[in-house]
Amino acid sequence: MANTLEYAKIFETNLDKLAIQTLKTGFMDGNSGQVKYNGGNEIKIPSIALQGLGEYDREKGYTQGSVVLKYQTKTMTQDRGRSFLIDAMDVDETNFVATASNVMGEFQRTRVTPEIDAYRISKLAEIAMGVEEDAQAEYSYTIDNSTIINRIKNGIKIIRENGFDSELVILANYDTTTAIEEAVLGKITSGTFSQGGINTKVPFIDDCPIISVPKARMYSAITLKDGSTGGQEDGGYEKGSSAKDINFMIVARETPIAVTKQDKMRIFSPEIYQKANAWSLDYRRYHDIWVKDNCKGSIFVNIKDAKA
C-alpha cells in the first residue's frame, strides 16, 4: 500500500499552486511577503512610522529622526473545509491518484476559487465604501459604452491624487469589459500580466491591466454557508442580503495583503477509514485579506446600485 502521506503532499503542492494561478485575485497573494507567517491561523503585519525632514545644521549636523517598526497580529478569519469520500469500488490504488486529482482539482476550480475571489473583492469593496464622503466609491452607475472609459479614468485619477503611483489593477465584470472593448473598437492596448508564474495577455487602460471577473464574484458583501445547517448543505457562498453589484474595482497591486494556505491534507485509505469502504479526503483552507490603514485611498469601487 502506497504511503497516503505522499499522496497528500502531492495534492497540497499542486492545489496551492493551482489556487494562485486560477484566482482572479491571485496577484494579491504576491503581497504576502509583507507579513510574517509561520503557519497556523495568525500573521503579523508590519507598520513603519517615520519622521519627516528637518534642517541640516553645519555645526551640529543632522537632526535626529526616529523609526518605529511595529507588528500587528491578525487572525485569519476564514477557516473552511470539506471531506469527500471516493468509494473503493470506483477506484483502486493504481488509479486513485488520477481520480482524486480530478475530484480535488474540480472542487478547487468550481467551488474554492470563486469563494476566495468573492470574499476578497467584497472585503476590499467594504473598505472603499467605508471611506468618508464616498471619496473612494461611486454609486448608481449603469454601464454605458459612451461613459465607461471616463468612469474608469476618474477612478484611476482619484487613486493617483491620493499619492499612490504604483501599478494599479482593474477588476471588472464582463459587462464592463465588453463595454470597454466596444467603446474603443479594438483599439485598446494589451500587455502581459503575471500571476503565480503564469503570464497572460490582458487589455490595459492607462497602463492598468483589466482582469475580467464573473458577476457572481463581484458583490459588496457575501454570506458564507456552513455546509451543514438546513438550506446550507451545498456550502460555498451567496450574495449578501444587503449586497450591491460591483461594476469594477481599481486597486493598487501592492495594497491587498492576501494569504491563503491549505492545511495538511489528510487522506485515509479504505483499510484505515472505518465509516465506509472508501477513500476519505479531508480538505481545509485558511485564508484572509487585509489592507493597512494608510492604504485605503488606493482602492476605488464603482457600484451599479444606489447607495441607500
Regions found by a protein language model. Give the residues of each.
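Generic structural signal of hydrophobic/aromatic residues within well-ordered alpha-helices
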Residues: 11-15, 19, 23, 116, ...
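Long, contiguous amphipathic alpha-helices that act as assembly "spine/axial" helices in icosahedral shell
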Residues: 45, 71-133, 147, 151, ...
